[in-house]
Design a protein with these regions (language model features):
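A structural signal for short, hydrophobic/glycine-enriched beta-strand patches
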Residues: 1-141
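A transmembrane-helix-recognition feature enriched in membrane-embedded lipid enzymes
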Residues: 134-157
């Protein structure tokens, strides 16, 4: 069974998914509707504004016609490493043979590396960045340089 692991992003005031969170979630809904994945795991804990990232994704997925039975929630994680680590029991419960990590293209290589180092068979699928705010996209891309170095350091054991 292929399961999409949707990595979290910010929730804005009033529980509104940020553009990044919305883009990832809608992309995952498309994978489910297209039959490319059989279940979805929304990952992400509580940031600055409620609800948790995972709950904001669940609400958006439901509004896009994904049934609640196809959605699992990992609502405690605070970063990419925790997203994947804390989703592993949910993947096992679902009998997942492969995780399809749904995140932005700039983030996908690090997320795949973490997943593989944690023993998951993982690929990634990224939404289009068309219409994204260019300065934000550039900042996210540049952030991946130190974030990847930190991930390698954390996973060295």
């Amino acid at each position: 069974m292929k399961v999409a692991l949707i990595l979290g992003a910010a929730v804005w005031p009033g529980g509104v998914p940020s553009p990044t969170l919305r883009r990832r979630t809608l992309h995952a809904a498309g994978l489910w509707h297209g039959g490319e994945v059989q279940a979805l795991i929304a990952c992400g804990g509580l940031g600055t504004h409620p609800p948790t990232e995972a709950e904001a994704m669940r609400r958006l997925l439901l509004s896009e016609g994904v049934p609640d039975a196809a959605i699992r929630i990992e609502g405690r994680s605070r970063n990419t490493h925790e997203n994947i680590l804390l989703a592993r029991p949910l993947l096992a419960d679902l009998g997942a043979t492969e995780a399809v990590i749904v995140t932005d293209a700039t983030h996908a290589p690090r997320a795949r590396m973490i997943a593989r180092r944690l023993g998951l068979r993982a690929s990634s699928s990224s939404p289009s960045l068309r219409g994204s705010h260019l300065p934000t996209t550039l900042r996210q891309g540049l952030r991946e340089i130190p974030a990847t170095a930190l991930a390698l350091w954390r996973l060295r054991r």
